[in-house]
Amino acid sequence: MKIRFVQPLFVLFIFSVLVYADDSWMLYDDTEVDVVEITIDPEDLDWIYDNVESDSLHPAVVHYSNEWFDETIDSVGFRLRGNTSRTSAKKSFKLDFNHFVPGRDFYGMEKINLNGEANDPSIIRSKLCWDLFHDIGVISSRATHIAVYINGDYYGLYISVEHVDDEFLAKNYVDDGGNLWKCLWPADLTYRGDDPEDYHPYYDEERPYNLKTNEDEYDYSQLARLIEIINQTPDETFPDSLEAVFHVEEVLKYFAMNVLVGGWDDYWFLMNNYYLYHEPNEDRFHWIPFDYDNSFGVDWFSIDWTATNPYEFPIIDGGPRTLAERLMDNNQYRDLYSHFLQYFLENVYPLSFWENHIDTLYSLIYPWAEIDVYRTLDYGFTLDDFTQSYSSEHYENQHVKRGIREFVNLRVNSFTGVLQYTGAPPIVYDIVWEPKNPQPEDSIHVTISAFGSNSVENVIIHYYDAPIPDYTEYPMEFNPVPNTKLVEESDRWTGTIPPLGSGMTGYFEIYVEDGNGQGAVFPRHEKITLQTPGVPTDELAINEFLAK
């Protein structure tokens, strides 16, 4: 369940100014292929290629051009990036704009990832995944195609993927000062003990849980707490405890989209490739997707990813995936997950919703793919492989078992009769209110998203005037956004709490009831607090009386 705190109007105004001042969108515009020309000392480049596991940064001059700008930047850090791609002939690179010039960024970005996509003859699979995640409102990296030149030579068509770091956090979260962990294999979120040090990197110097912000404090206590709750909490208190520290709806959407795109290089199958961000202002974790070149029919395990069971996704080692298992074992979460899958299958994922986007990107990148010699070096992919990767007919070459359109059509058809609902009580999975810090005369506008497999028939705000134990009821109305790809907008209910008056403290919660009369109250773990500034009206009256 997501509880989003909305700032007062004057803070919202400041925040909106900051958003509009962020020019990073110009780096991720799909209207043309960007061009980056990197000039580096040839001896440095040779050293980088001779030491592929090194993360040493070397100075380079970068000329970056697209529809919006044409600029040259000196003293940019340059190195290889990635895991298995380091040994590929078509390598992936990282540009670091503030390593040699501290504090510098480039159109709001301190770092840019240039991914070679050596596994993918289409050079588009990960880009399509990022676009789908953005369509459904999951906070994730932006991506665009880019032509890479090094010392005058064309190194091929790449995908520029937004780096997840403190700049990413600042663009996407109200409070960007929290701990961010990069989670790589074998990041299975299993319990190792109560001591936060039990979760310090233990497989190697960085894996599986690598703290990427606030490294000086090196505090793993929040992560240890989350993992303990996932693994040690009894079933009867599991939802209350988990929702108090974690945005459950985010990981359910992540699971649903991964199942649809065949994204197996993830937590559920491979205990790999995700970020966890602890946002301090709400003391809760966010789930951030990562790395999607292995999708849409790319397979190394002889598994038909168009036909996997969405409730029992394959697990490479047969080991525990406690988070996924416990979410699927809880009927409310299982039904919400099924609802997300059904909504995406009806409103987002079928080709009718995004085939034109695929066609546009294909036409845009074809000339650059045609002259990309490096894309042929690792697996011998030809231009025909590039073209057939977009086919709705059967295509197969080595680890690429399906064309993209073929995969999508088969995956959609595979869900016929598969989704099942348990009839669990309804759930409220998103709560938004504004203003967060109301003035005495402000009404508080509440928006929630709720789902029940037996329909949601009644939603009521329960408002408590502190310290009075009784509540006042304010009804909410079903108010969905038509033709939206955001499931939470389709499940939207709205209501209003009248002005509280001066110096008041109150609390509210949401009561939701389905067509079978099953009811529940959210948030489960605590009511939401509202406060207004000033002196309470009754105290003011007494003071005035005494003054007379």
Spans of model-derived segments:
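Internal "kinase-insert"/substrate-recognition segments embedded within catalytic cores
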Residues: 94-102, 109, 116-117, 136-141, ...
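Middle-to-C-terminal accessory/interaction subdomains
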Residues: 24-26, 31-35, 44-46, 72-76, ...
